[in-house]
Amino acid sequence: MGLARLSLRLRIFLFFAALAMGNLAALVAGLVFGFHKLARPEALSGFVIGGTVAGLVILGLIGVVWALFDANLARPIERLAGSIRARTQTAVDSALDESAGRYLGDLAPAAAAIAQHLNETRSALTEAVQRETTRLAREKDRLETLLSDVPVGVLLCTADHALVFYNGQAVDLLGGAHAPGLDRRVFDYLHPAPIRHAHARLLATADPDAASDLLCATVADGRTLAARMRLISEGEDHQVRRLAGYVLTLRDVSADLRAHAGREALMDELFDRIRRPAAALQSLMGVLIAEDGPADPQARAQLREAARAEAGHLAQAIHSLHDRHEAMRADWWPLAMIRASDFGAAVQARVAAEGAGDLLPVTAALLLRLEGFEMVALIAHLVRRLGPGRAEKRLEVLEDGAGALIALEWRGAAVAIADLELWLSEPLDVGQAEVTGRRVLSVHATDLWPERLHEGRHRLCLPLREARRIGPDPHPVPRPVPRQVVYDFDLLGRGGESALAETPLDKLTFVVFDTETTGLFPTGGDEIVQIAAVRIVNGRRVAGEVFDTLVNPGRPIPAASTAVHGITEAMVATAPAIAEVGRRFHKFAEGAVLVAHNAPFDLEFLRRKELLIGKNFDNPVLDTVLLSAVVFGAAEGHSLDALTHRLGITIPEEARHTALGDTVATAEAFLRLLPALKARGLTTFGAVLTEVRKHGRLMRDMNA
């Protein structure tokens, strides 16, 4: 190993050690020469004593000088180098501390001036870039909003079937306890066979615009999804196409398939239940009207009775099937859940736009299942047909059992049934002549009738089969970033798998995590009470992929621990146990490098529960304590507070000593350490691992 690869402090130590050895060698040589020159054997003891004293004095002086050099030159230079490297490679903008380099002459002030100039230049550049990128950021936000609310799930995958993009609808469609994550295999969420076959078909075709329709099922709950796959064309070359990724659009057709199966079953039952009595009736009627039929009155009476019985069976079957048809018909039409207040406002606006007078909507806090556009057109049509002679019109939406009642009230003359039927037979203004009020009622499997109220008021009643109250969810499920699109298109250009040790750091997927516990001693019965984690993919933290949950430790939480992290026994009383949480966390961290601040402490708690969890936490691990020592030197403070302060990261007071707050702070520190590591030539995982192993003693001291 060349001297240039050794640390500055070690090289200075070796220099003074060599100086000490040289002095001792010169002293010994001088004493030996003097003794032989004197040629008096009795003087040997004097030479030995004198040489020993002189040697110790030399070693002491050189040791003191080395200690002063180490404390006032080597360490400050190492600290100064780490600070400069942090400022040149990361976004640290705090002033450089000159006090540590007070014995370095003009070096520390010069370094501080360089850092200040760098900050000013960087700020000016940032402002210029910010001005130029504001418009692009707005366009990006608009595009993300658009893609987050398209009515289908959208996945973008690499040729190796790793996720590069997904939107909010895709998260809902894929379902399951484990949300999608960037750089995860799509086969974790969808059964692979249909996707592999469709991908192979598209790769084999020569048409760059070809698409493949397929049916696939979710791994979590077996829902059937209709999908369309299209390759991302990057050229006509066959090899380029083979390396291209693909877009997969998803739509849940489980309800459509159930509705289709229900219709098929109803039709089969219809023919089965009608065929036999109809055939029997045909035979009986043929016998009764035949000229050579039975002349005996008793026989003819029996035939007529049998015909009546078959007719009764037929009528009963028709009525039963009609009722089932009415009950199922609403499921055969795409109906959406719409707020009653929005429905009332839409009717009011349409009535006003058509000049049909005033209408007061009075709605309950309900979600209504209906075809909003056609139902609004129907109610507006009825208001218009009521005319100006009927005053004080009011639209009420009331809860009615499992459904709702839409009531159109007015003061004035009643509506005759014949007039109402005429109104319902008229076409509605929806752009299709065949859409009438009666058809809208049929789609919703409902009817409309008039009722008389008190004091000269009347109303038309229209019940809806399905509605539900709107209220706060007593157990809301937090969504880290609602309806968000999550993507990293750089993953498309990433090469294939390589050995972990040779993989560049910015190509790895990291899961940064932290735990809160009942105490500091896993061997003494302390347990985890909270786990939080975030994912870093392609060198950036994915905002929408967060793991954060309380854990029921199955034991009391000491007051001293609660004073640190704020977690009480009441907060974890209904939380899941470590067995369930551990399995979920293992899935979240699957295939990633684990990162933590003082990782041995957190991992010890998890590894002691591996048998209970049923999973082994054998992921590769990096520790930000050791990475800090690599960048800033072992002599610096390496607590999380010291590291974040050194890197210019602010931890909000309310987030301090919480699992998620410390996790986010550790992740930000880790991201700022990566450029500093690369500047030292540590670009691969193996190189970093080799370097951090030199600081193993520091980790042992921290956990002693």
Swiss-Prot record:
InterPro entries: DnaQ, Exonuclease_RNaseT/DNA_pol3, PAS, PAS-like_dom_sf, RNaseH-like_sf, RNaseH_sf. One of its GO terms (molecular function) is DNA-directed DNA polymerase activity. Residues 139-192 form the PAS domain. Keywords: DNA replication, DNA-directed DNA polymerase, Nucleotidyltransferase, Transferase. Residues 511-704 are annotated as: DNA-polymerase III epsilon chain-like. Disulfide bonds: none annotated. It catalyses: DNA(n) + a 2'-deoxyribonucleoside 5'-triphosphate = DNA(n+1) + diphosphate. The keyword Nucleotidyltransferase applies. GO terms for cellular component: cytosol. It comes from the Bacteria. Its EC number is 2.7.7.7. Pfam families: RNase_T. PROSITE patterns: PAS (PS50112). One of its GO terms (biological process) is DNA replication proofreading. Gene3D superfamilies: PAS domain, Ribonuclease H-like superfamily/Ribonuclease H. In the C-terminal section; belongs to the DNA polymerase III epsilon chain family. DNA polymerase III is a complex, multichain enzyme responsible for most of the replicative synthesis in bacteria. The epsilon subunit contain the editing function and is a proofreading 3'-5' exonuclease. DNA polymerase III contains a core (composed of alpha, epsilon and theta chains) that associates with a tau subunit. This core dimerizes to form the POLIII' complex. PolIII' associates with the gamma complex (composed of gamma, delta, delta', psi and chi chains) and with the beta chain to form the complete DNA polymerase III complex. This is DNA polymerase III subunit epsilon-like protein.
